[in-house]
């Protein structure tokens, strides 16, 4: 599809490979690095953007101010929980919180990776909070939620990548809220896939989600420390172990990919038995993050959705403000019903 007429192009920022940085003292556990500090030691050099691009008319986000937003934030603080909605500066925070839903981020708010598209802080995480599974379960019961998404920071410091902590959270949640549907948005479990999947299969979610994030050509710049094929294999292996559970993945558009590359990744997803797809616009969190290379028009997102359904995806959520957990409850119900029938 020719998209010149439906995209606002942004000049490419110089992202160049650089030599490995000199060793330095370890960051103290619990110290969160963000922005320029976070991306200072990744394999590519990111030159800070002098001026953030003007967003087109189709990207307008209301300020998340309402009693329900305040109530959920207060509850999260009470139980010492984190939401990815806040940590990753999600544009749908107001809509989701106002609707009484949230995506919970477990295992702390400090990530062991330095992905330069992401607004979550980097550093040396503190030890896992053994009370978090119970606290999360109580919060979900208090909110009377029917559908919950659980995600996490990357925890490369843990032998199982945090898989057992996910399982513990699922078990505790189902004790207090047996009818709730649970979606997990997991890290890639780098170097520990098999043990992580064995743990996951013993306490499975209702939807298993892991995002590819971008096309393989851009992995070195956007996902340092991650591997495109590894992520595809993780999703496929889970599906082989638990064929009745939907698998899900997503891409951010606007990092410099072409439409043809997006279509190719979608084809690869289907070859790896992925059931559900999300496509959304990348929005640069700060001047120190990867720059937006284009704003994809809603018509192009609609075209991707059409192509996705032709390929056999059971659900495609594709739009400028779509994120992994956006209207996830509605999508999951449709897909679960189709897998059962």
From Swiss-Prot:
InterPro entries: Aldolase_TIM, Elp3/MiaA/NifB-like_rSAM, LIAS_N, Lipoyl_synth, rSAM
Keyword check for rRNA-binding: no
EC supergroup of this enzyme: transferase
Keywords: 4Fe-4S, Cytoplasm, Iron, Iron-sulfur, Metal-binding, S-adenosyl-L-methionine, Transferase
SUPFAM superfamilies registered for this protein in UniProt: Radical SAM enzymes (SSF102114)
The keyword Iron is assigned to this record: yes
Co-factor note (free text): Binds 2 [4Fe-4S] clusters per subunit. One cluster is coordinated with 3 cysteines and an exchangeable S-adenosyl-L-methionine.
Occurrences of domain Radical SAM core (ranges): 97-314
Cofactor: [4Fe-4S] cluster
Residues at which [4Fe-4S] cluster 1 binds: 85, 90, 96, 325
SMART domains: Elp3
Residues engaged in binding [4Fe-4S] cluster 2: 111, 115, 118
Cellular location(s): Cytoplasm
Protein family (similarity comment): Belongs to the radical SAM superfamily. Lipoyl synthase family.
Protein's name in the database: Lipoyl synthase
Species this chain originates from: Pseudomonas fluorescens (strain SBW25)
